[in-house]
């Protein structure tokens, strides 16, 4: 049987695997509105940890927040959010930050030499940040950044540049535990886990620098990953954030509820047999 027989024509496409909120909205993909959680996030700790398994929408959630808070997307607010919850109930902080987004899952390189990968990834990201906000930062920022070596030192320089310009930053880190999960999956490298997350480890040093930014130009920070293990071991290095992964009020922020799935199936007129839920069988 043709799978298309299960779908009524002229319906919105499903954004499977997509993480670009602007494209989803601009090209009218099906989108489950989770923006009601934005005011709740603002009421929570300024430094927000959230752990969920893979394929739960973590990256898309961060992308939504980036578009909401970025000063560069102010003129697109109505197009992106106008008919969503947050478009009808905007907060005072919308489109008010310089946004720095780091995705550690995109770092390539050999496991035993990940520091070069981290440095390279951060260097490119930091330079793009300087170009994106060139008119809001001191004019020498990009050229001076190029003279600084290493992710930790470059991040420190960005703090100084933002502080000199009187700008506040919203830092997003996606898959913060990418390195350590890779280390833990390799029995030959297990000893390196302690080396990197304790003492003078490079990853620990990086998160210590993130912590330092919270006293200067980082106004808010949102960090996601798939495991709490690394976070626990880095806690003393980044001990001002709050883990909201098990907080009931945020349970529905990522992933789909049963009601949302049923609504989606109804929208697509799926003629699929679904076994009754325990509630229906009572």
Task: Tell me the role of every PLM-derived stretch.
Residues 250-272:
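Conserved small helical "lid"/interfacial subdomain of P-loop NTPases
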Residues 167-190:
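Conserved P-loop NTPase "ATPase switch" module shared by AAA+ and STAND
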Residues 3-69, 73, 78-87:
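Walker A/P-loop-proximal flanking segment of P-loop NTPase domains
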Residues 80-127:
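P-loop NTPase motor core
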Residues 230-244:
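Short regulatory helix/loop adjacent to the ATP-binding pocket of P-loop NTPases
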Residues 158, 162, 192-218:
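Substrate-engagement module of ASCE P-loop NTPases
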Residues 172, 220-226:
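Structural recognition of the conserved hydrophobic beta-strand(s) that form the central parallel beta-sheet
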Residues 273-282:
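Single conserved hydrophobic/aromatic residue that forms the stacking wall/gate
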């Amino acid at each position: 049987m043709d799978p298309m027989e299960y779908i009524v024509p002229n319906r919105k496409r499903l954004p499977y695997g997509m993480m670009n909120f602007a494209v989803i909205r601009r090209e009218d993909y099906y989108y489950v509105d989770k923006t009601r959680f934005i005011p709740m996030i603002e009421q929570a700790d300024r430094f927000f940890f959230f752990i969920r398994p893979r394929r739960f929408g973590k990256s898309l959630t961060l992308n939504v927040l980036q578009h909401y808070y970025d000063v560069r997307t102010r003129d697109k607010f109505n197009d992106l959010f106008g008919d969503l919850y947050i478009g009808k109930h905007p907060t005072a902080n919308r489109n008010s930050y310089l946004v720095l987004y780091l995705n550690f899952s995109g770092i390539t390189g050999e496991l035993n030499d990940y520091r070069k990968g981290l440095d390279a990834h951060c260097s490119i990201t930091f330079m793009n940040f300087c170009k994106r906000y060139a008119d809001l930062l001191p004019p020498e920022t990009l050229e001076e950044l190029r003279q600084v070596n290493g992710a930790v030192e470059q991040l420190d320089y960005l703090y100084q540049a933002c502080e000199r310009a009187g700008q506040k930053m919203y830092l997003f880190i996606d898959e913060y535990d990418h390195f350590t999960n890779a280390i833990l999956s390799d029995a030959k490298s297990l000893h390196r886990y302690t080396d990197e997350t304790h003492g003078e480890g490079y990853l620990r040093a990086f998160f210590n620098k993130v912590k330092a930014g919270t006293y200067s130009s980082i106004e808010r920070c949102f960090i996601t990953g798939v495991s709490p293990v690394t976070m626990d071991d880095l806690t003393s290095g980044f001990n001002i954030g709050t883990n909201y992964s098990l907080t009931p009020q945020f349970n529905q922020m990522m992933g789909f509820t049963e009601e949302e799935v049923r609504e989606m199936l109804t929208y697509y007129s799926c003629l699929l047999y679904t076994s009754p839920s325990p509630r229906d069988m009572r």
